[in-house]
C-alpha cells in the first residue's frame, strides 16, 4: 500500500470502508470523481472545520493544502500535508513526494489520507480511506492530541459520509448503464 511507503510510523489514525456488490465498471475513476457537493452534511462539516467550499471530490483535496503524493491507478491514491500547526492552519509547501518522506523535523506534523479500491471478486469491491498522522515530538504530539480529541468525531463523520456518497453514486451510475 502506498500509505505504508509514505507514513509507515504514526501516532494517530482513522480507517473506514464500505462494500459494494455488483458488476461495476470504472469504479476507481468514479470514486475519484464522486461529487460531494450534494451532501449537506459534508458541506456543513467542511465549513465548520474551515475547509475550502470548493472541495467537491477526492481530486480536490489539493485545495485544502494537501498534495498528491502518489497513485497506483485503479487501486489507490494518496495525499499528504506537512504543518507545524496542530490545527492544520499553516500547511508547509511540499513540492514533491520525496520531500514529504524526507521531512522529519521535530516541530512538524505529517498527515496522509488515502482512498483505496480492493476488488475481492468481479462482483465484490471494498472502498476504504485511511488517515494517518505523525508528530515529530512529544510536545507537538500532545498539542495535536488535544485537537484530535475534539475533531476526530467530525473527521469520522466526513469520511463515512464520503464513502456513503461514493457508494450511492457508483450504484446509481450502474443502474443507468
What are the roles of these predicted feature ranges?
Residues 27-28, 129, 166:
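Hydrophobic pocket/interface hotspot
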Residues 123-145:
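Short acidic, glycine/tyrosine-flanked loop/strand segments centered on an H-E-D-like triad
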Residues 143-177:
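A conserved amphipathic terminal alpha-helix motif
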Residues 14-16, 111-113, 127:
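Hydrophobic residues positioned within well-ordered beta-strands of beta-sheet architectures
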Residues 1-60, 65-74:
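Hydrophobic ligand-binding cavity/cleft-lining segments
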Residues 114-116, 128-131, 147-156:
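Active-site scaffold segments
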Residues 19-23, 82, 116-120, 132-136:
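Solvent-exposed residues in well-ordered beta-strands and their adjoining turns
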